[in-house]
UniProtKB/Swiss-Prot annotation:
Residues 357-396 form the STI1 domain. It comes from the Eukaryota. The modification N-acetylmethionine is found at M1. It is found in: Cytoplasm. This is Ubiquitin-associated domain-containing protein 1.
């Protein structure tokens, strides 16, 4: 019987876990004396897009040892790279280096920039010297827009107070809001996807780093994996996200204070006890719906030199919009965070018109409406969700119509 020479002297066969950038995984078998380049070719045949007839396709990819975060050399063998059985390797496409521009291209680009350059102040004055003077009160326009946003928030603050008083008269209110409180306990906004976390930890990444990467990349495994590789040498990679630990401490302290206050109620009239209990539940719900600053925006603004508390205040005032928050920090910082919690004047025509509306009156007796107001107060971007809700949508529509009508008059 004839046996090929390479099979007689073949090394130990290893089973390797290969993970591609698109999230696909498979097992690849290779001997210890197989070169990294041959292993890469085999991996590309299995899971890469494009044709292997193009020799550049192999050179455009690289294999990374997940546990040690090393890029494997194509010229070395698996044994020389100290790869063990059941190790995890990542198949990643290399980033193409930016081509060096030619001198002719540089001069043409500079000429194009000069042609497209905006005119300076002197050029504008010369071009508009013969035009009649015209002034526009831009400040008034900006103030109107700011007043619209501010008044809408003030309306929600005042309506929440009214809804709480109305619902306190409902004998079933405590049970209803206990259920709402339990539902908020199951809120998964701050939880990390366990499946995604397990995928990254199985690749060899520490759990704390994997959790941080998933939060920064909206639970996307491929993006989180790239972030971990790019920031592997970053000394701040193990630093927790800004505001994350602070929120946990605040919620723990709040839970302790609420439990102690509940224990101190003692013996009193049954109606007073239910009102006190309802008040505590309202406080818990509001704490759980507290504003959550966008982690990436916080990091970006703090890198500019702003204090973490100032950054979170700016993002809260500007609904997590990073550019608007930056302008707020650099400007006069109006409105202030304290102004956001002030309600509208209860004797104002606007508030009286809203309370006199039958649809609003009926909606204020619905616990779901109160939860919707609380959510929109701290997360204004969720307004669309509540506008489309069959129970809260009609209430929001009436409030919007009344505001727009009185705002125009």
């Amino acid at each position: 019987m004839f046996v090929q020479e390479e099979k007689i002297f073949a090394g130990k066969v290893l089973r390797l876990h290969i993970c591609a950038a698109d999230g696909s995984e498979w097992l690849e078998e290779a001997t210890e004396d197989t070169s990294v380049e041959k292993l890469k070719e085999s991996c590309l045949k299995h899971g890469a897009h494009g044709s292997l007839e193009d020799p550049k396709n192999v050179t455009h990819h690289k294999l990374i040892h997940a546990a040690s975060e090393r890029v494997l050399s194509d010229s070395k063998t698996i044994l020389e790279e100290n790869i063990q059985d059941q190790d995890v390797l990542l198949l990643i496409k290399k980033r193409a280096p930016s081509p060096i521009p030619k001198m002719a291209d540089v001069s043409a680009e500079e000429k194009k920039k000069q042609e497209q350059k905006a005119p300076d102040k002197d050029a504008i004055l010369r071009a508009t010297a013969n035009l009649p003077a015209c002034s526009t009160d831009r400040t008034a326009v900006q103030t109107t827009m700011r007043d619209f946003q501010t008044e809408l928030r003030k309306i929600l603050v005042s309506l929440i107070e009214v809804a709480q008083k109305l619902l306190a008269l409902n004998p079933d209110a405590v049970e209803l809001f206990k259920k709402a409180n339990a539902m908020l306990d199951e809120d998964e906004d701050e939880r990390v996807d366990e499946t995604a976390l397990r995928q990254l930890t199985e690749m060899g990444f520490p759990e704390s780093r994997a959790s941080k990467a998933l939060r920064l990349n909206h639970m996307s495994v491929p993006q989180a994996m790239e972030w971990l590789i790019e920031h592997s040498e970053d000394p701040a990679i193990d630093t927790p996200l800004p505001g994350h630990a602070a929120q946990a401490e605040a919620s723990a302290a709040a839970a302790t204070s609420s439990s102690s206050s509940e224990a101190a109620v003692g013996t009193s009239v049954e109606d007073e006890e239910s009102r006190d209990e309802l008040t505590e539940i309202f406080k818990k719900i509001r704490r759980k719906k507290e504003f959550r600053a966008d982690a990436r925006a916080v990091i970006s603004l703090m890198e500019m030199g702003f204090d973490e508390k100032e950054v979170i205040d700016a993002l809260r005032v500007n609904n997590n919009q990073q550019n608007a928050a930056c302008e707020w920090l650099l400007g006069d910082r109006k409105p202030s965070p304290e102004e956001l919690d002030q309600g509208i004047d209860p004797n104002s025509p606007l508030f009286q018109a809203i309370l006199d509306n039958p649809v609003v009156q009926l909606g204020l007796t619905n616990p779901k409406t109160l939860l919707a107001f609380e959510d929109m107060l701290e997360n204004p971007l969720n307004s669309t969700q509540w506008m489309n809700d069959p129970e809260t949508g009609p209430v929001m529509l009436q409030i919007s119509r009344i505001f727009q009508t009185l705002n125009r008059t």
